[in-house]
Amino acid sequence: MKVGFIGLGAMGRGMATRLIDARHEVHVWNRSPEPSEEVVRRGAHREESPGGAFTGDAAITMLADDDAVRAAIIGRDVLRTAPKDLVHIVMSTLSVAFARELEQVHAKAGIAYIAAPVMGRPDVAAAGKLNILAAGDPAAIERARPLFDAIGQRTWLLGVEPHQANVAKLAINFLLASAIEAMAEAAALAERYEIDPAKLMEVITGTLFAAPAYATYGKLIIEGEFKPGFKLTLGLKDMRLALAAGEAMGVPLPFASVVRDNLVDAIGHGDAGRDWSAVALVARRRAALRGALRQQ
């Protein structure tokens, strides 16, 4: 398939490379040109504008937030000249309100639109092992299936209205953030009682919580380096979006408010550029523990 790819951040580079490796014809655009150099060396075609990525069978958008998608897609009016049989696949984590707006914009333009946010960190994207949360017209999803198969290990169908996939992603990210917060607090409690937090995490991930989320983020909390795979600022964005989605439907999310406030606390202490698991430092400060575990 001829596919455009917009957004070559930490996730997008790995995803675009997987498409190239699967022998799709990939045309890329990124606001700053430097990130595209790696995928161009691998065989992608560099485009000079977002519209250049909207000339084939499909176009994938993997940008950071509502504003970035709005600027690249609506601001550049790329749908006006796109082929009518093109499928636009938005894989960004967006607000529900903006996802609904995109539904209307695409319907007016006569362009098929799928929301397909993903689960997984950059290393998972590079390995082609993402989980894809897809919603939209079933026929359009089937047309996109070869692309999803190249990028992910499984595609989960969550509804016929694209914004349903965005709601699912926000719910999952809220749950993941809650798990990180709970592990951080549990580790701080154990350490104050002179229990080795690494040993506690070994028990946690080897018994009742033997799941990838706990294993991955438990390890990051214990190592204490917090190299960014998913930045604190993006985690804060997603908690705000989850709270807004809940408010719109009268669904309280009190723990999301706690996590949001702790992410704000971490950013206020200079950790904005670190992985969102660095929220563990907030629990440590409040427990009167110094620094990160391995940095002591």
What annotation goes with each model-predicted range?
Residues P50-A112:
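Rossmann-fold NAD(P) dinucleotide-binding segment
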Residues M1-M62, L86, P122:
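NAD(P)+-binding Rossmann beta1-loop-alpha1 motif at the extreme N-terminus of oxidoreductases
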